[in-house]
Amino acid sequence: MNFLRGVMGGQSAGPQHTEAETIQKLCDRVASSTLLDDRRNAVRALKSLSKKYRLEVGIQAMEHLIHVLQTDRSDSEIIAYALDTLYNIISNDEEEELEENSTRQSEDLGSQFTEIFIKQPENVTLLLSLLEEFDFHVRWPGVRLLTSLLKQLGPPVQQIILVSPMGVSRLMDLLADSREIIRNDGVLLLQALTRSNGAIQKIVAFENAFERLLDIITEEGNSDGGIVVEDCLILLQNLLKTNNSNQNFFKEGSYIQRMKPWFEVGEENSGWSAQKVTNLHLMLQLVRVLVSPTNPPGATSSCQKAMFQCGLLQQLCTILMATGIPADILTETINTVSEVIRGCQVNQDYFASVNAPSNPPRPAIVVLLMSMVNERQPFVLRCAVLYCFQCFLYKNEKGQGEIVATLLPSTIDATGNSVSAGQLLCGGLFSTDSLSNWCAAVALAHALQGNATQKEQLLRVQLATSIGNPPVSLLQQCTNILSQGSKIQTRVGLLMLLCTWLSNCPIAVTHFLHNSANVPFLTGQIAENLGEEEQLVQGLCALLLGISIYFNDNSLENYTKEKLKQLIEKRIGKENFIEKLGFISKHELYSRASQKPQPNFPSPEYMIFDHEFTKLVKELEGVITKAIYKSSEEDKKEEEVKKTLEQHDNIVTHYKNMIREQDLQLEELKQQVSTLKCQNEQLQTAVTQQASQIQQHKDQYNLLKVQLGKDNHHQGSHGDGAQVNGIQPEEISRLREEIEELKSQQALLQGQLAEKDSLIENLKSSQASGMSEQASATCPPRDPEQVAELKQELTALKSQLCSQSLEITRLQTENCELLQRAETLAKSVPVEGESEHVSAAKTTDVEGRLSALLQETKELKNEIKALSEERTAIQKQLDSSNSTIAILQTEKDKLDLEVTDSKKEQDDLLVLLADQDQKILSLKSKLKDLGHPVEEEDESGDQEDDDDEIDDGDKDQDI
């Protein structure tokens, strides 16, 4: 407290002493009065004094005010006065002091009083509990006080809230408050709470903050809303920026789709309010947070795809091509579109198809390039267009080819009715504006980045300099302008273009060296002792000459690697050359450009280096330095080693391709096996259905048998009078004929059964022979399992067939028994001595029963015939199943042979790869002995790839 009293020590003592006594008396009343009204009035008086006499009230009353919060929670009025007083003490928002240093002193007071307040973490917990009160006069001052604490000392207050039970959840309830002022101040509170604290950001996000904030933005009118929309957008940025977990949660929650209505602008775009411009600017920044190049590539790619699928990219392109858009919004929209399409092939293809609403329509890329090479356009807009063009070409070989194609003679519009991207780049490259030269050179370099094919294609470009003079190549024209001594920005841009063009392209190096004036110009530039401004150009010239040495294929006799190194040693000196080469990476603007891809410069004179070029310098600086110090013998040995390694790589690639082909063949064979299994299952299903049908016929036959037995019983009991009228012998003879027919059918069925038995014996013998052959053959581990499955299926089919045969035999036996009973009935002798009347009655009854018996016998014959036909159909299906099994056995034998051959080929490949690895190790050891560095990571990566392929081969053999 003594320290706090010393802050205001320079003030006069008279009136302040009186006020200090008043404050002391009020504090005594708050502490000692037993009446609630007295305490309330005292706290209200302290509140009125707290703004003007902040220091005195803070020193004397803070403890008493905290005690009031603890003991008088039942009275909302005194709680509200106490919270307002504490807010006035801690907050720096409202000041009435007029001294010069009042602002600095008030900030110190606020942080010091905040430190005193949070020294006891229970005070913050008490404040959080007060926020649960629904009373407006308690909740709103509590929100303001907690916000002020977070602004003064954010990290310690955040930590206290984080460890407090349900602390963050209580604050999230503020967003659902129906009173707008509390809800809006709750948004400000969450802004301060989530600033630079990833743990709290995650908790807030999982407390459904995204849903609530987006609802508020929609209710307020999206971009047409007021400052509440701005506050919500700032809070969303706090939650998403550099927080990969929340970004993934935002994408998977389908919240990206809800951003599309933000960018729906009408046809009338004039007269935008300042708040709308601010809101839309923050919305665009929020989109960029989700697709920032600094995010993990996988997360960025998924967000880019989601933005295309929901139409957000299309909406941004509409703003891009609209008229009447404010300049800063247009610039930020270009930057946003740039990062949405960067490295995403689908988005890049869509952007290439966008046309500007002009007559005739022009591609959006052409319209943007026209702005980039126009020196009257704002500098930030030109930088944004360059960034957009770079992002369009990033990892986009198709787009690179389309841009380079517009420079080739076959694609140039002879009528001159339309302007192509290539023509605009050439126009900017040879313009009198140095910034246009730099932008066009960097843009063209990005069209060649990592694309050897387009580097060779660009060598075909011919330029007509003037009427009557022959055309010159683009490469030659660049070197001509370089030698004319133009502005530094122009020369730096051309040198970056040439370095990108010649790197990893020996053909371009040959074309460059073919002009005899280029090498003397470079050596002359490097050898001179110039000022600091020219040192950067000297470093770039040294880099270009080093690239011409490192990527030289020695096709030009006068400019081989050895002769160029001798020239450097003679005219420049190796140490001097390496020193000049090091000027590039030591430059201040080089380190600034290497930090992020976006070309963001405060003014045009800082626009020197490109981000992708800094990566190229980092890659080539070391290898060029080593190449300069190498002798000719080392170069020859290195070339031999490179050739050997290339041959080895070709061999390994060839065998890898062979192994891949064999893997594909094995996969096809596996698919065939699975198809045959499916067919076998279908056959089993058919057999099951047939078995069920046989069971049905068997049941019907049993029913007929029972009925026939009853009829025979009645016929035996009444057969005594059959002979009286002479009818019984005729009927018996007819029955015997029917029985003979049944016997013939039985014989036919027995013959078919014998054929089936012989077929089963043949199948058993073939199965035994197949098992012996399979036992002697060497098959992959999985083939015996497949064969065993097929055998089990065959055994099941045979068992079903045997059961069906037994059932047919049983039916035949029962049929024979019925025939024997019929014959017994036919042989029975009638009894004499009955009267004619009784005989006539019995004869009539027997005739009726006999006719019924004949009818039943006829139906039985029909059923037996149907069973015979059904059995024949089953026999045919079984024959087809046997043929299918034979085909499967044949296919399996073929698979055995093919897998055996594949195993032998893979064994040969493994032996060959082992020999090649041994050769590589010996070559590496020789290289190390010669002092040549060996890239361990690449080689280990290749070895891992080889090991992976060998492991895959072993797995296939296991299959």
From Swiss-Prot:
It is a peripheral membrane protein. The modification N6-acetyllysine is found at residue 202. It is found in: Cytoplasm, Cytosol; Golgi apparatus membrane. It comes from the Eukaryota. Residues 925-959 are annotated as: Disordered. Keywords: Acetylation, Coiled coil, Cytoplasm, ER-Golgi transport, Golgi apparatus, Membrane, Phosphoprotein, Protein transport, Repeat, Transport. Phosphorylated in a cell cycle-specific manner; phosphorylated in interphase but not in mitotic cells. Dephosphorylated protein associates with the Golgi membrane; phosphorylation promostes dissociation. InterPro entries: ARM-like (IPR011989), ARM-type_fold (IPR016024), Armadillo (IPR000225), P115_Arm_rpt (IPR041209), Uso1_p115_C (IPR006955), Vesicle_P115 (IPR024095), Vesicle_Uso1_P115_head (IPR006953). Pfam families: Arm_vescicular, Uso1_p115_C, Uso1_p115_head. ARM repeats lie at residues 20-60, 61-121, 123-163, 166-207, 208-253, 255-310, 311-354, 363-408, 420-459, 473-513, 518-571, 573-630. Residues 1-637 are annotated as: Globular head. GO terms for biological process: endoplasmic reticulum to Golgi vesicle-mediated transport; Golgi organization; intracellular protein transport; regulation of cellular response to insulin stimulus; secretory granule localization; small GTPase-mediated signal transduction; vesicle fusion with Golgi apparatus. Residues 638-930 form a coiled coil. PROSITE patterns: ARM_REPEAT. The modification Phosphoserine is found at residues 50, 940. Residues 935-959 have a biased composition (Acidic residues). GO terms for cellular component: cytosol; fibrillar center; Golgi membrane; perinuclear region of cytoplasm. General vesicular transport factor required for intercisternal transport in the Golgi stack; it is required for transcytotic fusion and/or subsequent binding of the vesicles to the target membrane. May well act as a vesicular anchor by interacting with the target membrane and holding the vesicular and target membranes in proximity. Homodimer. Dimerizes by parallel association of the tails, resulting in an elongated structure with two globular head domains side by side, and a long rod-like tail structure. Interacts with MIF. Belongs to the VDP/USO1/EDE1 family. Composed of a globular head, an elongated tail (coiled-coil) and a highly acidic C-terminal domain. This is General vesicular transport factor p115. The lineage of its organism: Eukaryota, Metazoa, Chordata, Craniata, Vertebrata. The gene is Uso1.
